Swiss-Prot record:
GO terms for cellular component: cytosolic large ribosomal subunit. PANTHER family: 54S RIBOSOMAL PROTEIN L1, MITOCHONDRIAL (PTHR36427), LARGE RIBOSOMAL SUBUNIT PROTEIN UL1M (PTHR36427:SF3). It holds the Pfam family Ribosomal_L1. Gene3D superfamilies: 3.30.190.20, 3.40.50.790. The keyword Phosphoprotein does not apply. GO terms for molecular function: rRNA binding; structural constituent of ribosome; tRNA binding. It comes from Burkholderia cenocepacia (strain ATCC BAA-245 / DSM 16553 / LMG 16656 / NCTC 13227 / J2315 / CF5610) (Burkholderia cepacia (strain J2315)). GO terms for biological process: regulation of translation; translation. This is Large ribosomal subunit protein uL1.
Length: 232
């Protein structure tokens, strides 16, 4: 642990916590700090100008990252008949109805995301206490309850990420891996920011995107100058 601590301290010394870094410099620093033996994730934290305690200011949604997430995703789908076949053809690993519900109740959850056709919610609704705490409960707001299950599966496989503001008004999301090229990370970040802008509550006043910071799994936070995000 001491070795990791010393490395983290060395990286922290390179980063000015008060400075706003141009996006290119921020990505360069974050990638440099990602020196663990595994391919660290590159994460973003976005402080929003909303009151997270108000139900009409809860920011939630999903976005397909153009460069993907660098993670292989296993998808489970609640569907029947033709929609079940479409889900399988789109690449879903697990497709079912009551049988899938029983697997979940038995603790067999070898998947990363759950998608449901609207007509299956009578079954899915009984799984709220199991799927909810794990962040797996299908929801129309993030596109996981939809009649077009095939597209939902394809989006999940293509690098879709879900986001939801926490109690502190912050959005946390992964935009790729340390092995990604800076251009890929930047395009993913831009896609996320665009999605957040579209999800801005009508009742939100003042500055909406207050702070943006990047970090790797084992690295330190680097603040981003938002003005440089718009520059091409």
């Amino acid at each position: 642990m001491a070795k990791i601590s010393k490395r983290r301290q060395a990286f922290a010394a390179k980063v000015d916590r008060q400075k706003l870094y141009a996006i290119e410099d921020a990505l360069s620093l974050v990638k440099e700090c990602a020196s663990a033996k595994f391919d660290e994730s590159i994460d973003v934290a976005v402080q929003l100008g909303i009151d997270a305690k108000k139900s009409d200011q809860v920011v939630r949604g999903s976005v397909v990252l153009p460069a993907g997430t660098g993670k292989s995703v296993r998808v489970a789908v609640f569907a029947q008949g033709e929609k079940a076949e479409q889900a399988r053809a789109a690449g879903a690993e697990i497709v079912g109805m009551e049988d899938l519900a029983e697997q979940i109740k038995a603790g067999q959850m070898d998947f990363d995301i759950v998608i449901a056709s609207p007509d299956t919610m009578r079954i899915v609704g009984t799984l709220g206490q199991i799927l909810g705490p794990r962040g797996l409960m299908p929801n129309p707001k993030v596109g996981t309850v939809t009649p077009d299950v095939a597209t939902a599966v394809k989006n999940a496989k293509a690098g879709q990420v879900q986001f939801r503001v926490d109690k502190a008004g912050i959005i946390h999301a992964t935009i790729g891996r340390a092995s990604f090229e800076p251009t890929a990370l930047r395009s993913n970040l831009s896609a996320l920011i665009e999605a957040l802008q579209k999800a801005k509550p009508a009742t939100s006043k003042g500055v909406y995107l207050r702070k943006i910071a990047l970090s790797s799994t084992m690295g330190v936070g680097v603040r981003v100058d938002q003005a440089t995000l718009a520059a091409q």
